[in-house]
A protein has these predicted regions:
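Short, low-complexity disordered leader/linker segments with a strong preference
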Residues: 1-31, 320-321
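N-terminal (or domain-start) structured segment
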Residues: 22-114, 162, 175-198, 203, ...
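An extracytoplasmic/periplasmic, membrane-proximal ligand-sensing/linker region
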Residues: 30-32, 262-321
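Hinge/capping helix and adjacent helix->loop/strand transition within the periplasmic-binding protein
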Residues: 82-92, 104-187, 238, 251-285
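Residue-level signal for nonpolar/aromatic packing positions in well-ordered secondary structure
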Residues: 22, 33, 42, 68, ...
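Solvent-exposed loop/turn segments at secondary-structure junctions
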Residues: 41, 99-102, 134-135, 160-164, ...
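Ligand-binding pocket segment of bilobal, Venus flytrap-like solute-binding proteins
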Residues: 152-235
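C-terminal lobe and pocket-closing loops
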Residues: 207-277, 307-310
Length: 321
């Protein structure tokens, strides 16, 4: 009888262990991740996201594959709407910057509170760019030409933040540059090189290759001081040209659907903290493109994001008036 009881207890323990193992949830993530880029190929968000994916995979920071998907349009809103429509919010993340914050707010795709913050990564510079053989080799050339023929020169913009920059140039210089909205920096570059527009708004990573190749030329930087990023070391700032009010920095980070689980949020916050500590990020991206590295974890980024969004909306209201 004792032997029978002992045997039955052993069987019960074994069966319980099997069911316990089978019922335990596997650690997140258990399937592939889609990294959505709410912009066209070749733009600043595209360059950053693909580098992030490369760093994550090379350093084995995520056990699953990560696939990049470009969904440009609507100043980021098209990609954000695509993310919102996904049935499993834990497996889709997307890049965000100040311009796409404005686009998402205006379209209602990421209104206040309707997102999950993962990490802030850095702060980017903004450039005023033209074709390398353009007759407008300096900002003074451009201003003189537009004042002589108001409305005759166009500036390509990828988003509302770019349009704010153009509006502020017009206010500062008393000019009438015309802004034209495109889906991304890649499209703006094509339009400049094709002679369809004369200028464009770019982040350094978007223009670096074409400036280095001699196709484009940056003639002004929206900053207090010059950048050390190649090939923009000699680009003058609006501040040194007598317009310290023309200073813009673009924050860059990563968000997810508002319904993402806390487990997934913390996983990605940790992943991006590790990414930001790598040489590939610090040197291969930030130093190369003049980006100021600035990591904030998911909770700190949420507090920052809400306040930054309010400031951006105030600037956009100024543009609308």
């Amino acid at each position: 009888m004792k032997k029978t009881l002992v045997f039955m207890l052993m069987v019960l323990v074994a069966v319980t262990a099997v069911f316990a193992q089978g019922g335990a949830e596997a650690a997140y993530p258990t399937q592939g991740i889609e990294f959505v880029i709410p912009a066209s190929a070749g733009g600043g968000s595209d360059i950053m996201a693909r580098l992030l994916i490369d760093i994550i995979q090379k350093n084995n920071l995520c056990p699953q594959t990560i696939t990049a998907t470009n969904k440009g349009g609507g100043s980021g809103a098209t990609g954000q709407a695509y993310v919102n429509a996904k049935s499993n919010p834990d497996y889709t993340i997307f890049t965000i910057n100040d311009a796409h914050t404005l686009g998402g707010n205006a379209a209602g795709t990421i209104p206040e509170g309707n997102f999950t913050t993962l990490a802030m990564l850095g702060v980017d510079e903004v450039l005023f760019v033209t074709k390398a053989d353009s007759p407008y080799q300096t900002m003074d050339d451009a201003v003189a030409a537009i004042k002589a023929n108001p409305g005759s020169l166009s500036v390509g913009c990828a988003d509302q933040l770019d349009r704010i920059c153009v509006a502020d140039i017009n206010e500062a210089y008393g000019t009438k540059f015309t802004d034209i909205l495109f889906n991304g920096a890649g499209d703006i570059a094509t339009a400049i090189l094709g002679g369809h527009i004369q200028f464009g708004m770019f982040n350094p990573n978007e223009a670096a290759a074409l400036v280095a190749s001699g196709d484009l030329k940056a003639i002004a930087l929206f900053s207090e001081q010059r950048t050390s990023a190649h090939p923009f070391e000699d680009v003058p700032t609006f501040t040194e040209m007598g317009h310290p009010e023309l200073v813009y920095k673009m924050t860059r980070g990563v968000l997810a659907n508002a319904k993402m689980s806390r487990e997934a949020q913390l996983f990605w916050s940790d992943v991006f903290e590790k990414v930001c500590a790598t040489d590939e990020w610090q040197v291969g991206y930030c130093q190369k493109y003049g980006v100021t590295p600035m990591y904030l974890n998911c909770d700190d980024y949420e507090a920052f994001y809400v306040e930054n969004e309010k400031s951006l909306i105030e600037k956009l209201a100024k543009l609308s008036n």
